[in-house]
From Swiss-Prot:
GO molecular function (one): N(6)-L-threonylcarbamoyladenine synthase activity
Binding site for substrate: L134, V135, S136, G137, G138, D167, G180, N277
Localisation: Cytoplasm
Cofactor note: Binds 1 Fe(2+) ion per subunit.
Function per UniProt: Required for the formation of a threonylcarbamoyl group on adenosine at position 37 (t(6)A37) in tRNAs that read codons beginning with adenine. Is involved in the transfer of the threonylcarbamoyl moiety of threonylcarbamoyl-AMP (TC-AMP) to the N6 group of A37, together with TsaE and TsaB. TsaD likely plays a direct catalytic role in this reaction.
EC identifiers of the protein: 2.3.1.234
HAMAP family cross-referenced by the UniProt entry: TsaD
Entry keyword NAD: no
Family to which this protein belongs: Belongs to the KAE1 / TsaD family.
Domain of life: Bacteria
Recorded name of the encoding gene: tsaD
GO cellular component, one term: cytoplasm
Name listed for the protein in its UniProt record: tRNA N6-adenosine threonylcarbamoyltransferase
């Protein structure tokens, strides 16, 4: 089965062609970072309009790159949620309309299921069952994964997602949007130990996360330095970024190890934008090796939103016989554990 995948849940337009026999044939991604940078964050209406402009040219490009014609495509998969409702509607309406015109089925894909399954596109994919850490700007969740669609939520953030905390800490340090990668780069120049921030909720049983207190601690450190010494210099900003990143990564690593120990599993999958963080990957590999566990993740280009993960996830559901009517349904909020198993 050959599937055209469309991703438009937020500020990236992703298109890909995946073939169940040949694997990923082609993918393209257009990022709206420059469009939203002057506003310091994503403007939903601008995101929707830019998806309208970019989607068709990207489809043409991917179809050509994959050597596919309309007759070669067996189905279309599009992101149906969660995400920005207007952006989702662009991809859903386009995907449904194109599928109707080509006389093929279309299926709506859960955005976070796409992220969760992105490591399956690697040469050495993880095997079920495993624990997944979904960590992005909108989600921080630990999920027990028995099979595609068989998900049990083990714990999640009770306030901000880790990626959102990265972005807000970056604003405190007057870094450019998007903040997460900026914090990570700046942290590499920081001095370890100059600032110390809490590891939220690691002293409590359970697998819930909280990052609002860490944001407050970071803001307090920035303001205290301003009052005593004026605006932080470059080295001070790097030291704060280093301490902040260490606190987030330590918290995630501790909870991931705890989740594996509680479930008795030996495989962890990390997915979502924050899974591209080099320190998170390195620290997880070291910590999990101590308990004989392994960590899997997607290549960097598939950590952020992309069409390849949507094409793959949609293909698996279509191969399992999932069918949908012609009505367009998208959801700004959509619990992962509400999905049907295959």
């Amino acid at each position: 089965m050959r599937v055209l995948g469309l991703e438009t849940s937020c500020d990236e337009t992703g298109v890909a062609v995946y073939d169940s026999a040949q694997g990923l044939l082609a993918h393209r991604l257009y990022s709206q970072v420059k469009l939203h940078a002057e506003y310091g964050g994503v403007v939903p209406e601008l995101a929707s309009r830019d998806h309208v402009r970019k989607l068709l040219p990207l489809i043409d490009e991917v179809m050509a790159a994959s050597g596919s014609t309309a007759a070669d495509i067996d189905a279309i998969a599009y992101t149906a949620g969660p995400g920005l409702i207007g952006a989702l509607m662009v991809g859903a309406a386009f995907g449904r309309s194109l599928a109707y015109a080509w006389g093929i089925p279309a299926v709506g894909v859960h955005h976070m299921e796409g992220h969760l399954l992105a490591p399956m596109l690697e040469a050495v994919p993880p095997e079920f069952p495993f624990v997944a850490l979904l960590v992005s700007g909108g989600h921080t969740q630990l999920v027990k994964v028995m099979a595609i669609g068989d998900y049990e939520l083990l714990g999640e953030s009770i306030d901000d997602a880790a990626g959102e905390a990265f972005d807000k800490a970056a604003k405190m340090l007057d870094l450019d949007y998007p903040g997460g990668p900026q914090i990570a780069r700046l942290a590499e120049q920081g001095v370890h130990g100059r600032f110390k921030f809490p590891r939220p909720m690691v002293d409590r049983p359970g697998l819930a996360f909280s990052f609002s207190g860490l944001k407050t601690a970071t803001l307090t450190a920035v303001n205290a330095h301003k009052q005593a010494n004026g605006l932080p210099d470059d080295q001070t900003c790097a030291d704060i970024a280093c301490a902040f990143q260490e606190a987030v990564v330590d918290t995630l690593v501790i909870k991931c190890r705890r989740a594996l120990e509680q479930t008795g599993m030996k495989t962890l999958v990390i997915a979502g934008g924050v899974s591209a963080n080099k320190k998170l990957r390195a620290d997880l590999e070291v910590e999990l090796a101590r308990i004989g566990a392994r960590v899997f993740y997607a290549r960097h280009e598939f950590c952020t939103d992309n069409g390849a993960m949507i094409a793959y996830a949609g293909c698996q559901r279509l191969l399992a016989g999932q069918q949908e009517g012609l009505a367009i349904h998208v959801k700004a909020r959509w619990p992962l554990n509400s999905l049907s198993s295959l």
